[in-house]
Amino acid sequence: MKSEVIAEAARATLDGSIPFPEVVRRLMETGVEYSHVDYVALQTSFYSATGEVIKTPINYEKLPPVANNLDRDALRSAILDSQQNGQPYRDFTERAIKAGVQGYIAFLRGKRVTYWGRDGEQHTEWFPGAKPDNA
């Protein structure tokens, strides 16, 4: 994995300068298999298939505390707003945290994201068009 490519993709995600599909493409090209966004530690960890890990900060200020319970409807609404209306990542982050998301893992090869709340409750969302018929 190339740390400079990952750092640039992370920065571009936070400031909204490139769309999510382009971020995924760049990360996969540099060997990222999955990433873990941690809203408590305010960092994202990027993992390769060989076990290499690169961490970048989430440098947003004044984020709300993670809500006590995972509100799947509010989370799904935030996800759809990002997918369909190009919602800025900062806004998505705030809405996800208010919906009780403590963190999530984006499985790039698997084309899905699993979100979880403070009590371990989970929600998995497929990348647009990637959900198999049997899922």
Segments (PLM) and residue ranges:
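Short, solvent-exposed interaction modules
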Residues: E52-Y104
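Glycine-rich, aromatic-bearing surface loops/beta-hairpins
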Residues: V113-A135
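Acidic (E/D-rich), amphipathic helical modules within compact regulatory domains
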Residues: P19-K62
